[in-house]
Protein backbone atom coordinates (compact mmCIF):
# COMPACT_ATOMS: atom_id res chain seq x y z
CA UNK A 1 0.00 0.00 0.00
CA UNK A 2 1.33 3.44 -0.99
CA UNK A 3 0.43 6.29 1.34
CA UNK A 4 0.78 9.99 0.60
CA UNK A 5 2.08 12.17 3.42
CA UNK A 6 1.16 15.76 2.65
CA UNK A 7 0.60 19.05 4.40
CA UNK A 8 1.56 22.69 4.41
CA UNK A 9 5.32 23.38 4.20
CA UNK A 10 6.76 23.29 7.71
CA UNK A 11 4.28 20.88 9.35
CA UNK A 12 6.88 18.10 9.61
CA UNK A 13 6.35 15.85 6.58
CA UNK A 14 10.05 15.15 6.02
CA UNK A 15 10.75 14.72 9.72
CA UNK A 16 7.86 12.27 10.17
CA UNK A 17 8.88 10.34 7.06
CA UNK A 18 12.48 10.07 8.26
CA UNK A 19 11.12 8.58 11.51
CA UNK A 20 9.02 6.15 9.45
CA UNK A 21 12.13 5.25 7.41
CA UNK A 22 13.98 4.59 10.69
CA UNK A 23 11.19 2.13 11.54
CA UNK A 24 11.89 0.24 8.30
CA UNK A 25 9.32 1.72 5.94
CA UNK A 26 10.18 2.77 2.40
CA UNK A 27 9.85 6.51 1.77
CA UNK A 28 10.02 8.56 -1.42
CA UNK A 29 10.63 12.30 -1.07
CA UNK A 30 9.03 13.73 -4.21
CA UNK A 31 10.95 17.01 -4.11
CA UNK A 32 14.21 15.04 -4.26
CA UNK A 33 12.85 12.83 -7.06
CA UNK A 34 11.77 15.93 -9.01
CA UNK A 35 15.33 17.28 -8.84
CA UNK A 36 16.87 13.92 -9.77
CA UNK A 37 14.47 13.41 -12.71
CA UNK A 38 14.89 16.99 -13.90
CA UNK A 39 11.12 17.34 -13.40
CA UNK A 40 11.25 20.92 -12.15
CA UNK A 41 9.60 22.93 -14.91
CA UNK A 42 10.23 26.40 -13.53
CA UNK A 43 10.97 28.41 -10.43
CA UNK A 44 8.29 30.81 -9.25
CA UNK A 45 10.57 33.42 -7.70
CA UNK A 46 7.72 35.61 -6.50
CA UNK A 47 6.24 32.76 -4.44
CA UNK A 48 9.65 31.15 -3.80
CA UNK A 49 8.32 27.85 -5.10
CA UNK A 50 9.16 25.29 -7.74
CA UNK A 51 6.68 24.18 -10.42
CA UNK A 52 7.09 20.44 -11.00
CA UNK A 53 6.03 18.05 -13.74
CA UNK A 54 3.18 16.27 -11.94
CA UNK A 55 2.66 13.82 -14.83
CA UNK A 56 6.27 12.61 -14.62
CA UNK A 57 6.04 12.28 -10.84
CA UNK A 58 2.71 10.41 -11.05
CA UNK A 59 4.30 7.98 -13.48
CA UNK A 60 7.23 7.54 -11.09
CA UNK A 61 4.91 6.78 -8.15
CA UNK A 62 2.81 4.37 -10.24
CA UNK A 63 5.93 2.44 -11.28
CA UNK A 64 7.60 2.52 -7.86
CA UNK A 65 7.69 -0.94 -6.26
CA UNK A 66 8.42 -0.48 -2.57
CA UNK A 67 9.58 -3.36 -0.42
CA UNK A 68 7.70 -2.30 2.71
CA UNK A 69 3.95 -2.31 3.20
CA UNK A 70 2.92 0.35 3.78
CA UNK A 71 5.31 2.69 1.99
CA UNK A 72 5.17 6.48 2.01
CA UNK A 73 5.29 9.23 -0.63
CA UNK A 74 6.11 12.63 0.87
CA UNK A 75 5.58 16.17 -0.41
CA UNK A 76 3.16 19.08 -0.07
CA UNK A 77 1.72 17.81 -3.38
CA UNK A 78 1.79 14.07 -2.53
CA UNK A 79 -2.02 14.10 -2.30
CA UNK A 80 -2.05 14.56 -6.08
CA UNK A 81 -0.21 11.27 -6.62
CA UNK A 82 -1.74 7.82 -7.26
CA UNK A 83 -1.70 6.40 -3.73
CA UNK A 84 -4.05 4.22 -1.71
CA UNK A 85 -4.41 6.62 1.21
CA UNK A 86 -3.64 10.27 1.99
CA UNK A 87 -2.43 11.43 5.38
CA UNK A 88 -2.59 15.22 5.77
CA UNK A 89 -0.35 16.41 8.58
CA UNK A 90 -1.79 19.41 10.42
CA UNK A 91 0.01 21.76 12.79
CA UNK A 92 -1.30 24.62 14.90
CA UNK A 93 -0.51 27.91 13.13
CA UNK A 94 1.41 29.32 16.13
CA UNK A 95 3.77 26.31 16.03
CA UNK A 96 4.00 26.55 12.24
CA UNK A 97 4.92 30.23 12.54
CA UNK A 98 7.75 29.36 14.95
CA UNK A 99 9.11 26.63 12.67
CA UNK A 100 9.00 28.77 9.54
CA UNK A 101 10.77 31.64 11.33
CA UNK A 102 13.48 29.19 12.47
CA UNK A 103 13.91 28.07 8.86
CA UNK A 104 14.43 31.68 7.82
CA UNK A 105 11.29 32.08 5.73
CA UNK A 106 10.49 35.71 4.82
CA UNK A 107 7.27 37.17 6.27
CA UNK A 108 5.44 36.92 2.92
CA UNK A 109 6.14 33.18 2.67
CA UNK A 110 5.20 32.66 6.32
CA UNK A 111 1.92 34.49 5.65
CA UNK A 112 1.16 32.28 2.63
CA UNK A 113 1.83 29.05 4.53
CA UNK A 114 0.00 30.14 7.69
CA UNK A 115 -3.05 31.01 5.65
CA UNK A 116 -2.88 27.67 3.82
CA UNK A 117 -2.68 25.75 7.11
CA UNK A 118 -5.36 27.89 8.78
CA UNK A 119 -7.96 27.16 6.10
CA UNK A 120 -6.76 23.60 5.39
CA UNK A 121 -5.68 23.96 1.76
CA UNK A 122 -3.88 20.59 1.52
CA UNK A 123 -6.76 18.78 3.20
CA UNK A 124 -9.30 20.52 0.96
CA UNK A 125 -7.33 19.67 -2.18
CA UNK A 126 -6.97 16.04 -1.12
CA UNK A 127 -10.71 15.77 -0.43
CA UNK A 128 -11.50 17.39 -3.77
CA UNK A 129 -9.18 15.05 -5.71
CA UNK A 130 -10.33 11.91 -3.88
CA UNK A 131 -14.07 12.66 -3.83
CA UNK A 132 -14.22 13.36 -7.56
CA UNK A 133 -16.48 16.35 -7.02
CA UNK A 134 -18.93 14.69 -4.59
CA UNK A 135 -18.68 16.59 -1.30
CA UNK A 136 -21.43 14.95 0.75
CA UNK A 137 -18.77 13.74 3.19
CA UNK A 138 -14.98 13.51 3.05
CA UNK A 139 -13.65 10.34 1.45
CA UNK A 140 -12.41 7.68 3.85
CA UNK A 141 -8.99 7.59 2.19
CA UNK A 142 -8.12 11.15 3.30
CA UNK A 143 -7.13 11.37 6.96
CA UNK A 144 -5.93 14.37 8.98
CA UNK A 145 -3.31 13.88 11.70
CA UNK A 146 -2.67 16.74 14.11
CA UNK A 147 1.05 16.65 14.99
CA UNK A 148 1.01 19.74 17.22
CA UNK A 149 3.13 19.14 20.32
CA UNK A 150 4.25 15.67 19.25
CA UNK A 151 7.84 14.49 19.09
CA UNK A 152 9.20 13.02 15.86
CA UNK A 153 8.60 9.46 17.13
CA UNK A 154 5.14 10.29 18.51
CA UNK A 155 4.11 11.84 15.20
CA UNK A 156 5.28 8.75 13.27
CA UNK A 157 3.38 6.51 15.69
CA UNK A 158 0.27 8.68 15.29
CA UNK A 159 0.52 8.36 11.49
CA UNK A 160 0.80 4.56 11.72
CA UNK A 161 -2.17 4.47 14.12
CA UNK A 162 -4.23 6.54 11.66
CA UNK A 163 -3.24 4.21 8.82
CA UNK A 164 -4.10 1.07 10.79
CA UNK A 165 -7.44 2.36 12.08
CA UNK A 166 -8.33 4.53 9.07
CA UNK A 167 -9.20 7.28 11.50
CA UNK A 168 -7.50 10.58 12.22
CA UNK A 169 -8.19 13.88 13.88
CA UNK A 170 -10.82 16.56 13.34
CA UNK A 171 -8.82 19.74 12.79
CA UNK A 172 -10.49 23.15 12.71
CA UNK A 173 -8.13 26.08 13.13
CA UNK A 174 -10.84 28.50 11.94
CA UNK A 175 -12.58 28.35 15.32
CA UNK A 176 -9.31 28.55 17.30
CA UNK A 177 -8.77 32.11 18.59
CA UNK A 178 -5.00 31.73 19.01
CA UNK A 179 -4.72 30.45 15.44
CA UNK A 180 -6.79 33.40 14.23
CA UNK A 181 -4.52 35.89 16.01
CA UNK A 182 -1.40 34.22 14.60
CA UNK A 183 -2.69 34.43 11.03
CA UNK A 184 -4.02 37.99 11.46
CA UNK A 185 -0.50 39.23 12.36
CA UNK A 186 0.59 38.27 8.83
CA UNK A 187 -2.34 39.64 6.82
CA UNK A 188 -0.36 42.78 5.99
CA UNK A 189 2.07 40.61 3.98
CA UNK A 190 -0.64 39.18 1.69
Curated annotation (Swiss-Prot):
Fetch the Gene3D superfamilies from UniProt: P-loop containing nucleotide triphosphate hydrolases
Q: What is the protein's given name?
A: Putative adenylate kinase
Per its UniProt entry, which superkingdom is the organism in? Archaea
Entry's Gene Ontology molecular function annotations: adenylate kinase activity; ATP binding; ATP hydrolysis activity
Where do the segments described as LID lie?
102-112
Which protein family is named in the record?
Belongs to the adenylate kinase family. AK6 subfamily.
The reaction(s) annotated as catalysed by this protein in its Swiss-Prot or TrEMBL entry are:
AMP + ATP = 2 ADP; ATP + H2O = ADP + phosphate + H(+)
Region named NMP = 29-52
What EC number(s) is this enzyme filed under? Answer: 2.7.4.3
Q: Which UniProt keywords apply?
A: ATP-binding, Kinase, Nucleotide-binding, Ribosome biogenesis, rRNA processing, Transferase
Outline the subunit composition.
Interacts with uS11. Not a structural component of 40S pre-ribosomes, but transiently interacts with them by binding to uS11.
Q: Which residues bind ATP?
A: 10, 12-15
Extract the HAMAP family matched here: Adenylate_kinase_AK6
Any one Gene Ontology BP term: ribosomal small subunit biogenesis
Q: Which residues form a coiled coil?
A: none
Per the UniProt record, the lineage of the source organism begins with: Archaea, Methanobacteriati, Methanobacteriota, Methanomada group, Methanopyri
Per its database record, what is this protein's job?
Broad-specificity nucleoside monophosphate (NMP) kinase that catalyzes the reversible transfer of the terminal phosphate group between nucleoside triphosphates and monophosphates. Also has ATPase activity. Involved in the late maturation steps of the 30S ribosomal particles, specifically 16S rRNA maturation. While NMP activity is not required for ribosome maturation, ATPase activity is. Associates transiently with small ribosomal subunit protein uS11. ATP hydrolysis breaks the interaction with uS11.
